[in-house]
């Protein structure tokens, strides 16, 4: 059960700390990758040359890599004698040689203590953990993605739990009739309304794409079409499943994960992962890929007695 002894506010509006959520945020492969580095030329010099060196770096901007802009250009350190010295990223290793940089410095009247290769983080950090580790290698900029910050109220978690229990019952009943024992619901937290509930119907309809998620998305579309055709007020049209929450018994397959992405959902919550066919916790990580034009939050691991499904089944 969801914990309710949480906040100073009323139980309904109280926010639940993330540590008390009954599920865990699924991080993308980019958020869990280990430190990867790229070699760059670093120049070490006294602070009095800072203006000339930074101007020089600007002049050779064509030799820079935009992919390294997350690395702070300059860092301050103390030498063996306790004196302040500056270190600056000149350019990637392949762009110039140390001799070329040294010759340019000599022409500009810059005295460098040392020009050396150094491995800096190759990618920007996406999590607190990555930031703390990578920033110790070389200072990097980090801005927590606003879409990664989520809030659940006690009422909302209880409501989602109730929806999930109904889904488990529906999936179990469907399984007894020869279908794959999984189910999905689409929920609007802003109106506290369940817009669609569906089970898998591949066997019943003799159609391999009638997965529970695709059926639920279709029901939302039909509901919205009917509302538009019969409305008498000036209410706005809903764009697909924008900002909605999807609750499932099992991890969706790649097709359904993409269907949810195209439908512009805000978040997905499910109990059990499908390690061989899932589109979320696999390397696909479809819910949060930088190269796609939409991303949604995904949570899993809610310990509920969902029907058992073979690992090679595409949910």
Swiss-Prot record:
Name the positions where Zn(2+) binds.
211, 253, 256
**Listed Pfam families:** dCMP_cyt_deam_1 (PF00383)
Key words of the record:
Cytoplasm, Metal-binding, Nucleus, tRNA processing, Zinc
Q: Which Gene3D superfamilies match?
A: Cytidine Deaminase, domain 2
Please list the residue ranges annotated as the CMP/dCMP-type deaminase domain.
Answer: 158-299
Q: Name one GO molecular function term.
A: catalytic activity
For this record, the Gene Ontology CC terms, alphabetical, are: cytoplasm; cytosol; nucleus; tRNA-specific adenosine-34 deaminase complex
**InterPro entries per the record?**
CMP_dCMP_dom, Cytidine_deaminase-like
Localization recorded for this chain is: Cytoplasm; Nucleus
Biological process, per Gene Ontology: tRNA wobble adenosine to inosine editing
Task of the protein:
Structural subunit of tRNA-specific adenosine deaminase, which deaminates adenosine-34 (the first, also called wobble position of the anticodon) to inosine in many tRNAs. Inosine-34 allows the decoding of 3 different nucleotides at the third position of mRNA codons, as inosine is able to pair with U, C, and A. The wobble inosine tRNA modification is essential for cell cycle progression in the G1/S and G2/M transitions in fission yeast.
The UniProt similarity line reads: Belongs to the cytidine and deoxycytidylate deaminase family. ADAT3 subfamily.
Summary of subunit composition and partner proteins: Heterodimer with Tad2.
Q: What is this protein called?
A: tRNA-specific adenosine deaminase subunit tad3
Source organism (scientific name): Schizosaccharomyces pombe (strain 972 / ATCC 24843)
